[in-house]
């Protein structure tokens, strides 16, 4: 009997089972213990293979692929700390709903807790973050193949969102020629190998029931809050709110067109919050709200009912309103709850939104990050997409810009970390094949710098704008102690990215004004490669501009 041959047959069943649940993209890091999984993936023509030498970046690459494809994406890593590097991407997927299948190779049980090399306690290491966790036994013909495939099917068939951790121990030898070992074991699955359906078919349960009193509530004064959703959902939500005559507060990730732009500015005006107090119901569609003033209003508002609609399970309301948590696909829910044509009930808010936007426009000429955030909609590629980083940049775009309705916007706003942003953007581009504009801060770019290796492989133009404000300037917006702010919060690195781009053979520009930036953008959109554009700005100008605008709009 060949151990290496049966390891590969065991792995082949696992990988083939994944294809029955829509897995097409598979991300692979180098490793020896994962050889059976890697070779099984390589031999399966159903997969599109992606590789990366850094497991943390690999997990985020898979996250980006899953965001766009809306299908589960598999990841293969070897044993040891390689597994732990998947933790950030797994956490993000659990909060934002992407489906990740983590196949982690492991040492067999007799090599755990005895000093063996690269052997750690992997089962359960992700605690409660995976939606499902499977700790497989070592491959053996004593366990029927139908148990293995149905175990995989059960986890994936009931997976609604988040990650699945499948721990796969393999004994040595890991290498060797294939022989007939385990062939009859594998063949007991019969014509399953020629089929395209799961061995065990289950379906996730998704609540989509119509609220019987909707006809009553749609006649009331309502507010629509739009969080993270798809581009198509964003357009439908905008039309739905317009028909109802309800004000729509659209997040940067809502893709609704933000008909009342600069919400995070005008929500700081007492006239706006006073008018919103008249709302009898708030319907929030989508989660992961960005704006600080929006979150403050959301926490303090007290309508008679607060409904949250999202297909992610669990509580999504940190303010714990009295109301309803409706687990449903947003588009499906809108169909079940049609709008009734009514006149808008808000008068003050549209005026404030217009005045806030005019205040922003009046400051758009200076070459700075706040102005870039406002102008970003002018720089979007046609038929393309936008990837927005975290920290200050996403807040500035949320507060100062107005993105087109239905234009795809992606970000990692679940745990809102700055790790893995470039890797996620790479996955977003690969899955879509679209021209992509990505914008991050300098610390975010440094954090995931080796992901520039992933950006060498793009199928359409990708522009990475690095806004270099020399540190974590978001802390300038917080009451951090001034005496320790630079040393312990901002942490300026005093670096530029020209040599990093050159190391990975990427095009690079450092524009000094808007004309140079626009020329660099126009050139970059002409070729299917990655261009790094570093925009060096005064350290605190972005944060100060936002604070000045907040003060100005609050007194309108």
UniProtKB/Swiss-Prot annotation:
> Which reactions appear under catalytic activity for this entry?
isochorismate + 2-oxoglutarate + H(+) = 5-enolpyruvoyl-6-hydroxy-2-succinyl-cyclohex-3-ene-1-carboxylate + CO2
GO annotations under biological process? menaquinone biosynthetic process
The SS bond pairs are none
List the cofactors. Answer: Mg(2+); Mn(2+); thiamine diphosphate
For this protein, the record's InterPro entries field holds: MenaQ_synth_MenD, MenD_middle, THDP-binding, Thiamin_PyroP_enz_TPP-bd_dom, TPP_enzyme_TPP-bd
Q: Which GO terms describe its molecular function?
A: 2-succinyl-5-enolpyruvyl-6-hydroxy-3-cyclohexene-1-carboxylic-acid synthase activity; magnesium ion binding; manganese ion binding; thiamine pyrophosphate binding
Cofactor binding note from Swiss-Prot or TrEMBL:
Binds 1 thiamine pyrophosphate per subunit.
Give the enzyme's EC designation. 2.2.1.9
Q: Which UniProt keywords apply?
A: Magnesium, Manganese, Menaquinone biosynthesis, Metal-binding, Thiamine pyrophosphate, Transferase
CDD domains per the UniProt record, alphabetical:
TPP_PYR_MenD, TPP_SHCHC_synthase
Superkingdom assignment: Bacteria
Which pathway does the UniProt entry assign to this protein? Quinol/quinone metabolism; 1,4-dihydroxy-2-naphthoate biosynthesis; 1,4-dihydroxy-2-naphthoate from chorismate: step 2/7; Quinol/quinone metabolism; menaquinone biosynthesis
Instruction: Quote any Pfam family the record assigns.
Output: TPP_enzyme_N
Q: What class of enzyme is it?
A: transferase
Q: How does it assemble?
A: Homodimer.
HAMAP family for the chain = MenD (MF_01659)
Q: What does this protein do?
A: Catalyzes the thiamine diphosphate-dependent decarboxylation of 2-oxoglutarate and the subsequent addition of the resulting succinic semialdehyde-thiamine pyrophosphate anion to isochorismate to yield 2-succinyl-5-enolpyruvyl-6-hydroxy-3-cyclohexene-1-carboxylate (SEPHCHC).
Protein family: Belongs to the TPP enzyme family. MenD subfamily.
Under which name does UniProt file this protein?
2-succinyl-5-enolpyruvyl-6-hydroxy-3-cyclohexene-1-carboxylate synthase
User: Corresponding gene?
Assistant: menD
């Amino acid at each position: 009997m060949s151990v290496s041959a049966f390891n590969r047959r065991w792995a082949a069943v696992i990988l083939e089972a994944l294809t029955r649940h829509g897995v097409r993209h598979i991300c692979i890091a180098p490793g020896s213990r994962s050889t059976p999984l890697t070779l099984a993936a390589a031999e399966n023509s159903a997969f599109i293979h992606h590789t990366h030498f850094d497991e943390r970046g690999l997990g985020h690459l898979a996250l980006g692929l899953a965001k766009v494809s809306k299908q589960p994406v598999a990841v293969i890593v070897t044993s040891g700390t390689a597994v732990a590097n998947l933790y950030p991407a797994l956490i993000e997927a659990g909060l934002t709903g992407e489906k990740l299948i983590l196949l982690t190779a492991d040492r067999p049980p007799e090599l755990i807790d005895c000093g063996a090399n690269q052997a750690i306690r992997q089962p359960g290491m992700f605690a409660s973050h995976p939606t499902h966790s499977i700790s497989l036994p070592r491959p053996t013909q004593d366990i029927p193949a139908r148990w293995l495939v149905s175990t995989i099917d059960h986890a994936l068939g009931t997976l609604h969102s988040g990650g699945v951790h499948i721990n796969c121990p393999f004994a040595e030898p890991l290498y060797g020629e294939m022989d007939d070992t385990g062939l009859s074991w594998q063949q007991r699955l019969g014509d399953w190998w020629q089929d395209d359906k799961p061995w065990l078919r289950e379906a996730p349960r998704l609540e989509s029931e119509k609220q019987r009193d909707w006809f009553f509530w749609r006649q009331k004064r309502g507010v629509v809050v739009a969080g993270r959703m798809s581009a198509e959902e964003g357009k439908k939500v905008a039309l739905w709110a317009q028909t109802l005559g309800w004000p729509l507060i659209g997040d940067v990730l809502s893709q609704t067109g933000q008909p009342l732009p600069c919400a995070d500015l005008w929500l700081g005006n007492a006239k706006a919050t006073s008018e919103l107090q008249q709302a009898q119901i708030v319907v929030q569609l989508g989660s992961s709200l960005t704006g600080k003033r929006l979150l403050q209003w959301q926490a303090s508002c007290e309508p008679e009912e607060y409904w949250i609609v999202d297909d992610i399970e669990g509580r999504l309301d940190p303010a714990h309103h009295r109301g309803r948590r409706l687990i449903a696909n947003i588009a499906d829910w809108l169909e079940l709850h049609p709008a009734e044509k009514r006149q808008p009930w808000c008068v003050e808010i549209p005026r404030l939104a217009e005045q806030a936007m005019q205040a922003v426009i009046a400051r758009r000429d200076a070459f700075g990050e706040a102005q870039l955030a406002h102008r970003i909609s002018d720089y979007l590629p046609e038929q393309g997409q936008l990837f927005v980083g975290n920290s200050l940049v996403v807040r500035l775009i949320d507060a100062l810009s107005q993105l087109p309705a239905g234009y795809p916007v992606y970000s990692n706003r679940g745990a809102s970390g700055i790790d893995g942003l470039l890797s996620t953007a790479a996955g977003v581009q690969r899955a879509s094949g679209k021209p992509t504009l990505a914008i991050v801060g300098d610390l975010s770019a440094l954090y995931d710098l080796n992901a520039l290796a992933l950006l060498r492989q793009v199928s359409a133009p990708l522009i990475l704008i690095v806004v270099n404000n020399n540190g974590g300037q978001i802390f300038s917006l917080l009451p951090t102690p001034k005496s320790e702010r630079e040393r312990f919060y901002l942490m300026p690195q005093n670096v530029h990215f020209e040599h990093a781009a050159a190391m990975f053979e990427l095009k690079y520009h450092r524009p000094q004004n808007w004309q140079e930036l626009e020329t660099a953008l126009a050139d970059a959109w002409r070729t299917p490669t990655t261009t790094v554009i570093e925009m060096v700005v005064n350290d605190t100008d972005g944060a100060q501009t936002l604070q000045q605008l907040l003060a100005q709009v609050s007194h309108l």
